[in-house]
UniProtKB/Swiss-Prot annotation:
Disordered, as annotated region: 1-20
Name the record gives this protein: Cytoglobin-2
Reactions it catalyzes: Fe(II)-heme b-[protein] + nitric oxide + O2 = Fe(III)-heme b-[protein] + nitrate; Fe(III)-heme b-[protein] + nitric oxide + H2O = Fe(II)-heme b-[protein] + nitrite + 2 H(+); 2 superoxide + 2 H(+) = H2O2 + O2; H2O2 + AH2 = A + 2 H2O
Tissue expression as described in the entry: Expressed in all tissues examined, with highest levels in brain and eye, and considerably lower levels in skin, gut, heart, gill, liver and muscle.
Localization of this protein: Cytoplasm; Nucleus
Organism: Danio rerio (Zebrafish)
Gene: cygb2
């Protein structure tokens, strides 16, 4: 019965390749460096996200009218959301050994963004790309091709779980011009 339910939920969606033990170790090691300056890195990620994809700001009334990256950087609301994003990633990284915990955290994120905030799920894919871009720029010395591959697999898994939550709640795409 559980297998049938899982098949229904994942129908039409290819599950990403699972992380190996080595890849989980790589992610945990590099994340320790990133998380040491999590607020600054998180702010950099969100600023890049909003500058390159200004349509994403529509979901944030507190700073949707901000155009200047310096103004965004000073926004306490943006900093608060950056901490939330980084803390969610931290929870995932800390629990890579426990796929059920990772899934439950990401399903909560997905459901909240679908129900409460009405965020188009494509923004999670876009944000994943921005995260990878910033990590490579800010931590280039340790962001080898092997590290990039590990993080890319993690971002694919995050997106898969989050969009799975959207599917689970019966998300209907709002418009094709949102992005």
């Amino acid at each position: 019965m559980e297998k049938e339910r899982e098949d229904e939920e994942t129908e039409g969606r290819e599950r990403p390749e699972p992380l190996t033990d080595v890849e989980r170790g790589i992610i945990k090691d590099t994340w320790a460096r990133v998380y040491a300056s999590c607020e600054d890195v998180g702010v950099t990620i969100l600023i890049r996200f909003f500058v390159n994809f200004p349509s994403a700001k529509q979901y944030f009334s507190q700073f949707q009218d901000m155009e200047d990256p310096e103004e965004m950087e000073k926004s306490s609301q943006l900093r608060k959301h950056a901490r939330r994003v980084m803390n969610a990633i931290n929870t995932v990284v800390e629990n890579l050994h426990d796929p059920e915990k990772v899934s439950s955290v990401l399903v909560l994120v997905g459901k909240a963004h679908a129900f409460k905030y009405k965020v188009e799920p494509i923004y999670f894919k876009i944000l994943s790309g921005v995260i990878l871009e910033i990590l490579a720029e800010e931590f280039g010395e340790c962001f080898t091709p092997e590290v990039q591959t590990s993080w890319s697999k993690l971002m694919a898994a995050l997106y898969w779980h989050i969009t799975g939550a959207y599917t689970e709640v019966g998300w209907v795409k709002l418009s094709s011009s949102a992005v």
